[in-house]
Amino acid sequence: VIRLPRGCHTATHLVALAPLEYWESLYPSRTGVNWPAAASDLHKSSAAMGIFAAERIRGRGAWWDEGRTVLHLGDRLITPEGEHPITKPFRSRHIYQRLKRLEGPCGVEPLTVQEAGVIVGIANRFRWEVPASGTLLLGWVVLAPICGALRWRPHLWLTAGAGSGKSQILDRFVAPLLGDLSLVVVGATTEAGLRQTICCDAVPVVFDEAESIEKG
C-alpha cells in the first residue's frame, strides 16, 4: 500500500505506480502524457472509493475471508481454488499487501502417519513434568501457523529452570516445524518493537527466554 498525498500526483510519483507506457496509452498528449488529466481521474476515483480504512490491510499468514481460507505468503495467496499471484485482482473487501515472500508449506507433501509418529515420539521424549505436555506442544505447533484464521488463538508457555533446555526445544524442534511461518524474538524485545515488526502479519510469535529477571 502506497500513500500518495494530493500534491504528489506528479509524473515522478505516478510512474512509480505504473510504467510510463501505461500513462501514455490512457492520457496521451502532444508532449507525452497529460499528467493533470491523470491526476484528476485518480482524485475522482479515490473519492468514489470512499474513506480508506487501514484495518482492511492484511499481511502474511492465514486468514478467514467471507467463508473461505486465505493463506497470504507475501507474493501469492493460497485459497481453496489454488494459488493466486498477489499482483492480480482478488475479489475481497480486504487488501492483501505485497510483502516479502514466505515459502510456507507449498510444494511439500503432508507427512504420512508413520512420519508424524516420529515427530510425536520426539516430542514425548523430552523430560516433561506432566506427560501430556508433549502432546500439548504438538497441538500448538499444528495450530500456530493458521492462528490468524482462528477465532481463539492458543498460547503456550514453556517453563523450566535455567539451563534445562527450553531454548533447545524452541530452536531444534519447534522452529524447524514452523518454518518461516513464525516470528522468533528474544525476551528483551519490547511491545512497541514487536508491534512494529509484526505490523499486519498474522503469524505466531515465539519468545525465547521471555521471563522476568526481577526478584520480588
Predicted feature residues:
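Residue-level signal for secondary-structure boundary elements
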Residues: T31-G32, G50-A54, R127, P131, ...
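Short, flexible loop/turn elements at secondary-structure junctions
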Residues: D75, A162, E209-E211
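Short helix/loop capping segments that flank catalytic or ligand/cofactor-binding pockets
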Residues: T79-G82, S167, E214-K215
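Conserved nucleotide-sensing/catalytic segment adjacent to the nucleotide-binding pocket
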Residues: L194-G216
